[in-house]
Amino acid sequence: MKAYKDMTREELFAEKEKLEAMYQDYKGQNLALNMSRGKPSASQLDLSKGMMDVLRSDSNLTCEDGTDCRNYGVLDGIPEAKRLLGGMIGAKPEQVIVYGNSSLNVMYDSVARCMYEGVLGGKPWALQGKVKFLCPVPGYDRHFGITEHFGVEMINVPMTPDGPDMDMVEKLVSEDPLVKGIWCVPKYTNPQGYVYSDETVRRFANLKPAAEDFRIFWDNAYCIHHLYNGEPAQILNILEECEKAGNPDMVYEFVSTSKVVFPGSGMAALASSTANVASIKKQMAVQTIGHDKVNQLRHVRFFGDNEGMEAHMKKHADLIRPKFEALISIMEEDLGGLDIAEWTNPKGGYFIGFDSMPGCAKEIVAKMKEAGVILTGAGATFPYHVDPQDRNIRLAPTFPTIDELKLASRVFTVCVRLVSAEKLLAEKA
């Protein structure tokens, strides 16, 4: 089929009429499908059911340093859990603090700590005026929700296949002392699935911030979440690169097992310089005596080591890879050559980034909802839920069954084509 922009008004009208009939047919099926969040499917959750059996009433609940995991204590996590989580991102155990089940919780606490208690004994951000955060876009809506909650001004930074626009990052960070941080998902970015290049990581490590208390919030959420088991993507170790550059304290790195085992029942951690870790632990000691050591021990006993975790992740990949491939194949089949959309083809992570024609995303998402298919809200991938071009949509293929996904994908391509045809017809009026 020819590109929509090359069609005559009559051809475009005929196409719209055909698509409207297809759309009404889908609406009549009373669908109830959901592609809105990056949730593991039930089959993926089944992979970790064995975790429920590794600790029993007669199990030895003592960790390697002799601590009884049933009792109070161990503020920063048992040694073997620090080693396991650190191994996911190449951090040394002494750089790691193990928290509870949620890395989002850790990120929220980290921003709150900077706002109200300051960084390494410095003046709290909240007392310095209207502080700012750089936000690579499109990006993760829950990151933006945290900084919006604290009244931080968010500045859009365009994303490229190699990472954020580093010329813009370097300029803003070096010129404005009120720029205090940046959100990053460096590996298999949310939503596009990009991987930061070596040059990008090095440029981050070598930033020269005007603010002494500037921090990179490095959310390595998908560090081992590969779709293909051949040559997985690799990124430079930001902790090591910052140390080489003489900026060891500049990064907070976050990691969790939420999409490795059971979301809500995993482990989360922060990794940073020994100075940052010492400062955070001093503040944490007022907040808690320690997190769930039994769960930490359960993880270690289940996986054994990082090789065991990597073998487990290959099972996840085998389940979700066909879903990514099915969605991309259907988009290529139904939208290829029409010149009305672009999408990414990630090699890991949980999302596919989709760009419609400008001005169409909200209407596409609304039509999908009318047809019984829920997507992430248009604009969610931008601060304040405002996509300046109204074109980005985050697609999350992991949760539905493969048959549900294929059906939802067909509904999606019909909605994209219908909204695009209507827009072009209006422009040709």
Label each residue range with its predicted role.
Residues 353-358, 375-410, 414-415:
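Conserved PLP-binding active-site segment of the aspartate aminotransferase-like
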Residues 61, 67-212, 223-246, 320, ...:
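Conserved core of the PLP fold type I
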Residues 314-328, 340-355:
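Conserved glycine-rich beta-strand-loop-beta hairpin in the small C-terminal domain of fold type I
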Residues 2-76, 86-87, 370-373:
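N-terminal "arm"/small-domain region of PLP-dependent enzymes with the aminotransferase-like
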Residues 219:
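Glycine-centered flexible beta-alpha turn that most often forms the glycine-rich phosphate-binding loop
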Residues 364-370, 408-413:
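Short amphipathic alpha-helices in soluble, non-transmembrane regions
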Residues 99, 240-321, 334, 421:
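Conserved core segment of the aminotransferase class I/II
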